[in-house]
Amino acid sequence: EEKVGLRSLILEKFSKELLIEIYKLVKDWSVDNNNKRDILFDILNQYNIQYYPIGSGTNRYAALIDGYIFKFALDADGMIDNKREFKYCLPMQPYVIKTYEVLPDGLIAVCEYVELMTIDEFNDSRVRSKMRKILDDIGDSYFIGDIGIDAKNYTNWGWRKNTQEIL
C-alpha cells in the first residue's frame, strides 16, 4: 500500500513556540485588532519570519510569505473566517481564492496569491458585468457578506495569476 505524505506550509514556517505566541495574542481581549496587527509584526520579526505586509480586514491580517498569502486571525471571528474559507473554497471554484491549508483552530490559513484589482479595473463596465455574474452564480448557494460591487469592496476583488479569471 502506497503512503501519501502531506506537507504543511504553516508547520514548515512556524515553530510551535511561534504559534503559541500568535495564539496568545489572538486570545488577548484587552488588545484591539489594530494594535494586534502591530504586535503580530513584532512577533514575526522576533522569529525572523520574512514577510511582505498585504493588509488588514476586520478580523484578520494578510501577509505574503514565499509566494503564498498567510491569513492570521486577529480574534475568534477571524479564526472562524479562516475555517469557513477553507471549507467553502472548493465548491466555490473558480470564483474565490484557493485556500490550501488552515490550522484546525483557524489561527492561520494559507491561500493563493492573486493580483488585486485597481480601482480603475474595478470600475470598468465589462469587469463589473463579470462581477455581477459571479455574485449571481455564488449568491444562489452561498451567503457572501463582505463582497459586492460597491467601491468600498474593491480590495476584495483580484485576478488569478496568468489568467483573466476574476476572483
Language-model region placement:
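Juxta-kinase regulatory segment immediately upstream of eukaryotic protein kinase catalytic domains
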Residues: E2-Q50
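ATP-binding glycine-rich loop module of kinase domains
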Residues: Q50-I97
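Short, surface-exposed coil-to-beta transition loops
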Residues: G57-T58, P104, K152-Y154
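Active-site beta-strand termini and strand-to-loop segments that position acidic
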Residues: A63-G67, Y113, R160
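Hydrophobic residues embedded in beta-strands of well-ordered beta-sheets
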Residues: I69-F70, L107-A109, Q164-I166
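Conserved structural core of kinase catalytic domains
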Residues: P94-L135
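Protein kinase catalytic-loop region centered on the HRD/HxD motif
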Residues: D140-I147
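Catalytic activation segment of kinase domains across protein kinase-like and atypical kinase folds
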Residues: I147-L167
